[in-house]
Regions:
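Short connector loops at helix/strand junctions that flank enzyme active sites
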Residues: 10, 25, 45-49
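Active-site-adjacent beta-strand/loop module that shapes the phosphate/pyrophosphate-binding cleft
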Residues: 34-60
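A short coil-to-beta-strand element that immediately follows conserved catalytic motifs
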Residues: 23-33
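Structural detector for helix-capping/boundary residues
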Residues: 1, 15, 28, 74-77
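Conserved Nudix-box catalytic region and its N-terminal flanking loop in Nudix hydrolases
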Residues: 1-20
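Residues at secondary-structure transition points
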Residues: 3-8, 43, 68, 84
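Nudix hydrolase/Nudix homology domain
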Residues: 61-103
């Protein structure tokens, strides 16, 4: 999702997680950002994607909502990067998987 006008990254993160998964998580820790390009209605927007982490001690019950069709729990090392649409998210997952050339 996007950060609304006059909204902090942290507030947008909490709002988007609630809208998309119907769950409240946190506390969050900012880890890094990656540039991205997002095309909408024929216009190419340059954006910055911010990535945060939180620790889970148990799997919360999530409900796929809004733009989410389904959810699954998967080990980060098992994520198939070719199935991720946005370059910025592929780079972030690769970085978290420990890829040396991810940044």
């Amino acid at each position: 999702g996007f950060v609304d006008y006059d909204e902090s990254l942290e507030a947008a993160l909490e709002r988007e997680i609630q809208e998309e998964l119907r769950v409240t998580l946190g506390p969050w820790r900012y880890v890094f950002s990656y540039p991205n390009r997002y095309e909408y209605e024929g216009i190419l927007y340059k954006t910055i994607d911010a990535f945060f982490l939180t620790e889970l001690y148990e799997k919360p019950a999530v409900i796929a909502s809004d733009d989410v069709a389904d959810t699954v729990w998967i080990d980060i090392q098992e994520i198939d990067l070719t199935r991720i649409a946005f370059v910025s998210i592929r780079n972030a997952v690769k970085h978290l998987q420990g890829g040396a050339d991810a940044r």
